[in-house]
Structure formats: structure tokens, C-alpha cells
Amino acid sequence: MIEKILKDIKDLFKVQDKAKFLKQNIPYLAFFYVGNIFSHHIRAYTGGDVIDKIFQGILELNTMSFIPSIHLTDILIGIGVAALIKFIVYSKGKNAKKFRQGKEYGSARWGTRKDIEPYMDEKFQNNILLTQTERLTMNGRPDNPKYARNKNVLVIGGSGSGKTRFYVKPNLMQMHSSYCVTDPKGTIVLECGKMLEDNGYEIKILNTINFKKSMKYNPFAYIRSEKDILKLVQTIIANTKGEGEKAGEDFWVKAEKLYYTALIGYIWYEAPREEKNFATLLDMIDASEVREDDETYMNPIDRLFEALEKKEPTHFAVKQYKKYKLAAGKTAKSILISCGARLAPFDIRELRELMSEDELELDTLGDRKTALFVIISDTDDTFNFVVSIMYSQLFNLLCDKADDVYGGRLPVHVRCLLDEFANIGLIPKFEKLIATIRSREISASIILQAQSQLKAIYKDNADTIVGNCDSTLFLGGKEKTTLKELSETLGKETIDLYNTSETRSNQKSFGLNYQKTGKELMSQDEITVMDGGKCIFQLRGVRPFLSDKFDITKHKNYKLLEDYDKKNLFDIESYMKRKGKAKLNRETVITRVQ
């Protein structure tokens, strides 16, 4: 008991913040003053014990002097009185029962304009548009650091909920950043491309539906080091799994990795610039003949690596190839068959041409305002591995350039609006990338039909990805997992409940009982039947908002869209012809004929 009291006294006078300590103890100076002058008053009496003096002093308060005494006894008694009062107040507060009036079962509520105001930029254009009334500033370093939030957004909405109309298009109309937009069916570039071009944006298009309406993309053009080779191989493996193949990295997959790494390493180091592409990789695989009955047989690729080993025994590609060659003839043949099956899409001549050279210049998106539209099919995922490779390289290239060239931050923010994110495929290490891109002025908007889509692709890492999105926008849907998690994160509010009772007998009696109970701010069934014009927006550290979806017709740039005027339709073929002529003019060398 004594130890507990001593501990309380020690905690009572524990000083952590001097300014706060002084502020909290100023009121107790009044008790010090009362104790000091009363001590001086009763000390003036002689005779009798202390109790008699105290009673006598109380009876003659009108004669008490109000001038503080500097006598040591009076000072000590004043301090003692103040300390006693403080200890009583502290003990009462520590042992007091905690009542939260009106919040007994939960304190959830909908956010108001006052809640979101600190997170919005005064200049409308410098915001991410989320709802009709809620926005998020693009400034990653606000004056008050506690209002800093990353710009990663998780957008969830079932088919027809307006993910493109209510989120993608409004944010493209802001035109404050460079954009990389996944464009299912290729309609967004047609409707928004002219607006962006007229406002100084350079348009880039990667089209995996119609290769003839696409700019060329060559992953080999972005290999800077051996680690980039490993990343490229990993992305190919992760997104080109055949039907029925084991999910784990079994022997065959590891062997394929070795072979791809060896060949790509050779191409990157030794091949001329015009041959650094997938066509060369396919040609090398086709030339890798293996004879089961003749282990000494050397195919053309064996001879290439033999010559390279003589020139440079410790070459990166040679090391990988020697590991691959440890396989016996029959095993090596099986590996080659697996490689051929995995890269079968490259047998299409148009795809080879698409990836023969590079026109996208991915590493320049953070240098100047650029809009890259990635057109993918929403029904066929055959060529989605190309998109996955592109995004993997894009994130790594921009992060490296921010660190190596710009001191950690790109001059132009790059926003990746990843519509139909589940159809892109697996981006290796995306859970780590999304956690680190913020500081480089890069952000990702992950747009899904249901949250379960993310878990299907990224498994245990899905929660990490969601956790790195400070903003969540729900546009509507009925997938159970999404509804359950959303309802739980909204929390519970405390409501009043009353019960009525009726007793039937000779004399009727009625009863009315009032009590409080907890209720979800919005239950799963209420979310399911939510008005089609409403959406739910959640920002980390702020109450959720039930608001109207953004009305794009009210945006000042709406008149620049094809939605407003069919004359604003973006002509992809015409644009690419103009870009082709401009490129030809830049690269043409004129020589004088004597």
C-alpha cells in the first residue's frame, strides 16, 4: 500500500514537458497562497495546542493578513497544502469511472467538410478528385506534417459503377501530373487524348489489342544492369504460366530462369543494338538443338558461349549458361520445350515487330508532362504479360532516375491510373514498390471490381498493398468480402433504442423501456442498396465520407472531352503518323553530294 502511494506521488511530480508541467500546476498556487497566509495567521496565537490555534484562527478570520509570509514554516505549510490538494485531485482522476456519453457502443460518424478541409489544396487544379465534395492535395509536404498523406488510392467498384467516368476521367482533366493509364478497350485515349495533347502533353500508346495502332516497346532498351535482367526474367516467368503448371518454383521453372538469364545476358552484353530484343531471344532458343544420344554435340548457341568464355571466363552470361548445361540431354530438351511453350506468343510476327525497338521512352515520364495509355483487352489476357513487364520496368526506372538524377524526387509527379488492375497480371515486388514510390513523386491508383481480385493475384501481400493506400474510394458493388471489410472499417455508432411491452389481463398495462445499443455506421445490406449516385470515401486518420460521385460535367475542362463534343475524338493513327514524321525529321542526316 505504502509503495503504491509512493509510486503515485512519484508519478504526480514526474516532469516530461516543463512548459506543460508549469501550466498544469499554476492553479495550485492559489492553494499555496491560502495555506501560507493561514499558517501565518494561526502562528500569531500563543497558548493552547495546534487544534485550539486553528479554531481560534477560524473564528477571527477578519483579522487575518492577506500579505504572503516568507517565514519558512508558512512556506512549507503552503507547499504542503498545494501538494495535498494535487494528490487528492490526481487520485480521484486516476480512479474515476470512465463515461463516454453517447459513445458507449462506438463513436463512428460520417465526416464533414471541416474534417477534409486540412487535406485539400486551395487551388482546385492541385488536387486528386475523389468525390463531389472531397479532394486530396497533390502537395506531398504540406506546411503541417500531420496532414501529409500518400497519393495511392484504392478504388473499388463493380461493373457499371462508373470507375472510368467518376474517377479516371476527372483526374485526367486535372492535368497536374504525368499519367500512365490502363485503358481497357482503348476508349479513354479516344475520349481524353485530344484534351491532353492540346494542353502540351506528349501522348504514348501501348496497344495490346491492335498492334498496328501501338507504339513499339522493347524491354531490352531499359536494361541497365544485371539485376534488371533478373527482374525481366522474373516478370516473364510470373506472367506466362501455362495451364496446369505448378504454382511453386519447381525444378523446371528454375532451369528456365537460368536459361533465359544466360541468353538475355548474352544479348545485352554482346549483341548489336538492333538485335537487342525478344526476336533475337526466340531465334537463340530455336537454335538450341539438343541430341539425347550425343552429349558431345554442340549447337550454334553452345559455340557462341564457348567463344565468350574464352574471351571472358567470368562473364555473367557464361556463369548462368554453364549452370544450365549441367542438365543432361533429355532434361535440357524438356527445358527447351518449356521455354518454347512459355514464349509461344512471340511466334506472332506482329508481336515481334511491336517489341523490336522502343518508342515509349518510359524513363522520361517524370521529366515532362506525358500521358501513356496502355490499352489491354478486358476479355483476353494472352498479351497481358507485356503490360506487366512494362509496369515493372516503369516503376523501377522512375525510382532509379529520381534517386540518381533528381536527388530523390521527380520534377513532374507521375500518377499511374491502373484500371482493371487484376487484368494486368503480377508485377513482381509490387507490395514493396507501392510502399517506396511515394517519396519519388510517383503514385498508383489501384482500380478493382472487388477486393478479392487483389488477393487472388498477390495472395498474402494483398493486405500490404491495401495498407499502403491512404485513400479508399468505394463506388458500389455486391461482392461479399468487400462489403464485409468495408462495413467493419466504417465502425459502429451508438444509437438510442426503446422497447414497448403490453400486458393483457383484466387491466391492460403498457411499458416503455429506453436503452442504448451499437449499430454499424452502414451495414452490408445498406451498402449493397446504396444509391447509385453515392460513394464512400475513406482517408487515413479521418472519418469516412458518404458523398455524391464526382460530376464531370461540372469540371471546367469537360468541354475538351469527346463526351462533350464528338469533334474532340482523338485520332490515334493520325497522331502516330505525325509522330513518325517528326521522328524521321529528327533522325534524318543530310549529306551534300559533290
Labelled PLM ranges:
Residues 1-161, 165-168, 592-594:
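Basic- and hydrophobic-enriched, low-structure N-terminal and domain-boundary segments
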Residues 123-130, 385-393, 486:
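Conserved long hydrophobic alpha-helices within structured protein cores
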Residues 434-536:
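Conserved ATP-driven motor cores of ASCE-family P-loop NTPases powering translocation/secretion/packaging/pilus
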